[in-house]
Amino acid sequence: MKKFIIAEICVLLALAGGFWLGRVTGNNTSYEHYYDNADKAWTAVKQLDAPPVGLDSPDKSRLREVRAAYREVFENYPDSLWADDAIYQLASRISRTDEEAFALFRRLINNYPDSEWADDSMYAIAFASYQIAEELKKTGTLESLDAYYDRALALFNQLIATYPGSELSEQAQFNTAMCYYGKDELNNALAQFDILRVPFSDSPLLYQILYVTGEIYLKKQEYENARIEFTNVVDSGDPDLAPLASFGIPQSYLAEGKYQEALEGYQKVIDLYPDTKAGQDAYFYMGWAYERLEKYDEAIAQLEKGIELFPRNENAANAQVYIAQIALVNKDIAAAIDAFQKVADNATYDYDTRRMAQYWVGKIYEDNSETDLAVAAYQKLLVEFPEPHKEATHASNNVNENYIQTLRSTGL
């Protein structure tokens, strides 16, 4: 019996000894060098990322290697000094509107709330949400629009409350007002901007506040208040905002129906800021102000001047269409067709505008019983603009081979 007891004791001692030896010589070695290995991994990834590879880098293979290396740091060494840095650096190499980037930023905020990158991460998610909402608004997609603005609002407010000393706090306060503006909650936006005026009196954001306030008053049709705000920005001499604010003044007159004052204001923009986009736009808006005054010759001359000087301006296509429409109203058929054809043939203009113009060439010929020319114009529409107009009910979408065949037969 004793032999069995002694044997059992020996087995237990052997197991205990083996367990202890394993702790000393096994996995414990990796923990013993945990922080050294973390330092080495961080040094290696920084060397790999020198010079820093950006999201738009053409070397996608290197970008993938750098991303993988940063992930290895925070996945393998989550308690190291470098884990939060690695998460932030990886998230920064992914599109800010990508859900993977959101997940990484949230991970940093939740796991490392005291990190120097925590406020940046919160701001990144908030601003990306705001940008998504703005893009949805541009495309006319209203679904989820308020949800993105609301998410941005909540995160901007959380950043302000959680990190009051952050360098991003001021920008976050400004952006809360911009979220209200984006949601068309104009009174809330105005109230927020009014709150910021005094504390931001020495901030670089002050003139942005004044400019957007002017835009809000313009939307609210409070034209005199809009001009006051725009004038304050112009007087500041801000190189970026002063031209825009100067353009906003005649815009308010145009909206108010004071077309002569608008003309004078646009001319002032051209004189003061000829090399800015506002200066370019003023040429076109002068043409539209002349049209409102029923000075059609002056309107056409001004619009043609704008097109000649700035053929790639975003207003050029609409100006050319405007010229065609004025000619059509004046029953100058040849001029109208020529103007519409110029739009249709200009590859720098957007597809739908060109398709619409080509349709009108055919339509004018058809309405004037010039069947052969109408057929040729419509065939050109089908060949050069095979995709339908984005507006499902647009008249150009009704033109097809059957339409042309019917036109041929009825025109004989």
Model-derived segments and spans:
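Acidic, polar-rich low-complexity tracts and alpha-helical solenoid repeat scaffolds
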Residues: M1-L412
